[in-house]
């Protein structure tokens, strides 16, 4: 049996964000939610609506929850997601700081995971490009490409 959350993710991935949100929002409370998948989905749904304040609050909670559980996998995901929110708003310096924080976790806890490294380096390259640091951006983009092959 497929859960409401799985169905909502499927709807989101099909671009049906309002349908996805209707399916899960009544069960969602930022204050009590401890489900990383639901937090992540609600964050994406609110980002699609450009509700940056709520989205930021969700991913700050996501990071705090991961830290409380010493869950480095979800901590690095939360940092990456929060960086995407700041990037979407044009706050590239704050986005870069969060991506660099994520990089430290990936390097220390996932040193052999080239996918995590490639995704992080792509984001570093993209944000540095947006900051007009073109040489640095190219270095990170090339590194991302190498790691993804």
Predicted regions and their residues:
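Residue register of alpha-helical TPR repeats
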Residues: 2, 37, 77, 117-119
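Residue signature of alpha-solenoid helical repeat architecture, marking inter-repeat boundaries
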Residues: 33, 73, 113-115
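Amphipathic alpha-helical segments of tetratricopeptide repeats
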Residues: 25-29, 61-67, 100-108, 142-149
């Amino acid at each position: 049996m497929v859960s409401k959350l799985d169905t909502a993710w499927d709807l989101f991935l099909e671009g049906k964000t309002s349908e996805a949100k209707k399916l899960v929002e009544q069960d969602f409370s930022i204050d009590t939610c401890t489900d990383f998948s639901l937090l992540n989905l609600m964050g994406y749904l609110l980002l699609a609506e450009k509700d940056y304040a709520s989205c930021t609050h969700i991913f700050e909670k996501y990071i705090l929850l991961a830290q409380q559980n010493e869950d480095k996998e979800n901590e690095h995901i939360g940092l990456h997601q929060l960086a995407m929110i700041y990037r979407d708003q044009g706050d590239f310096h704050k986005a870069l700081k969060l991506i660099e924080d994520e990089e430290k976790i990936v390097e220390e806890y996932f040193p052999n995971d080239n996918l995590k490294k490639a995704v992080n380096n792509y984001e570093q390259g993209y944000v540095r490009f947006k900051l007009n640091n073109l040489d640095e951006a190219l270095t990170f983009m090339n590194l991302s490409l190498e790691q993804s092959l």
